[in-house]
């Protein structure tokens, strides 16, 4: 069993109170388990369940909160870094919310190769914005002159808004984050046309 300091999972006071109320009705020493199903994929789903004392594994990591602990299995662990659990009450009722920005893709180190850090930002920040249009972006390569070559898929493919979205939105966002390592972004079709412009 490990105590983990480098991975951070935030549980709000309201959510902790909610968990304590639920755990009072369970057998003694029951805690909670936080997990990710299909971690590292676009279909990743996070969940919370009861964790009876006999269900704790040697390889679990324990996070201690006020009045209970949360256990995380070793596979889910890196994908739950920076996760936030809250208990929200509104006129429609109360519900538990779980945000895990790294569930679909493991966080990369600050000193990782530029292409990995860039891909991480595209997967965790750019694609969720495009998902509402049914689109997504894939990083194909970074050229020697520091251009990121992107391929649009789904609802973005062949969409007349691609140029506007690409130039104004995504390029601006990525250049702000990587001012020294990136010169701009290009759509893969534009990049290929440029390479074969003598046809």
Curated annotation (Swiss-Prot):
One of its GO terms (molecular function) is 4 iron, 4 sulfur cluster binding. The keyword Metal-binding applies. Pfam families: Fe-S_biosyn, NifU. Keywords: 4Fe-4S, Iron, Iron-sulfur, Metal-binding. Gene3D superfamilies: Fe-S cluster assembly (FSCA) (3.30.300.130), HesB-like domain (2.60.300.12). Its cofactor is [4Fe-4S] cluster. It comes from the Bacteria. InterPro entries: Fe/S_biogenesis_protein_NfuA, FeS_biogenesis, FSCA_dom_sf, HesB-like_dom_sf, NIF_FeS_clus_asmbl_NifU_C. [4Fe-4S] cluster binds at residues 156, 159. The keyword Metal-binding applies. Binds 1 [4Fe-4S] cluster per subunit. The cluster is presumably bound at the interface of two monomers. GO terms for biological process: iron-sulfur cluster assembly; protein maturation. Belongs to the NfuA family. Involved in iron-sulfur cluster biogenesis. Binds a 4Fe-4S cluster, can transfer this cluster to apoproteins, and thereby intervenes in the maturation of Fe/S proteins. Could also act as a scaffold/chaperone for damaged Fe/S proteins. Homodimer. This is Fe/S biogenesis protein NfuA. It comes from Actinobacillus pleuropneumoniae serotype 5b (strain L20).
